[in-house]
Amino acid sequence: MELKKLDYDLTVCKVASIDDIDLKAGFFFTEKTDEEISLVCLTDDTPLHTTDRDDGWKGFRIQGILDFSLIGILSKLSNILAENEIGIFAVSTYNTDYILVKKENFHKAMDVLVTAGYTLV
């Protein structure tokens, strides 16, 4: 399975209002529930006003479009990283999944995943 290394720094944060998010930014994930509005974005695009903020994330994208009938893809990746004491923040889109790790664990995560048989592109 191919994983695409994302070559930018990411921030995970919470905002008080959806209006705080630049919807014209080139790359971001947002989730809104009855409890919070979360945002994952390029660190340089982080809104000025956040209620909580955690910088220093890097990521991988599972290449290709994942069919909803596929089982265990994210679980397998997260287990490999957990066995090597690397925490993750996972984000899913309609097509695929993204795995974020803290910047200080990024190179270790790449090495571990390649050793486990994944191809990084």
What are the functions of these language-model segments?
Residues 1-82, 108-121:
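Regulatory modules associated with amino-acid/nitrogen control
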Residues 36-41, 96-102:
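A generic structural motif
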